[in-house]
Amino acid sequence: MLITADKEAKIIIGNNVRLNGPTLIASRQIEIGDLCILGSAVVFDTDFHSVHKDRSTNRDAPVRKSPIKIGKNVWLAGQCAVLPGVHIGDDSVVGFRAVVTKDVPAGVIVAGNPARVVREISEESRHS
């Protein structure tokens, strides 16, 4: 499912990307690099609604909006979530049901809520 919710929304999907039912909610840019794999029910969301007490009645309540960028050859396992402002480096893996709240360096495996690095991927493994 692709949802664009703002005039600044833009979704860019690279070459040879495998999409297995992700949800992309964009009020800013979402960019997915070449050769990525997105598992089932992966969610990308470039904005968060305010936690302000009158958010349901105040249309001007602040909303955090930031782009998301996924590098090349990244695998996002099923049911993970990528939150506003995150950049995931090339050749990384995001584990099942991980919640990615901050940037992920290239060549690592992250898992958990919030996602954290659990292992580095060797140069040899990245390109085999």
Describe every region a protein language model picked out.
Residues M1-V86, I121-S128:
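Flexible, glycine/small-residue-enriched loop-and-beta-strand segment within the central core
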Residues H87-A111, A115:
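C-terminal/domain-terminus segments
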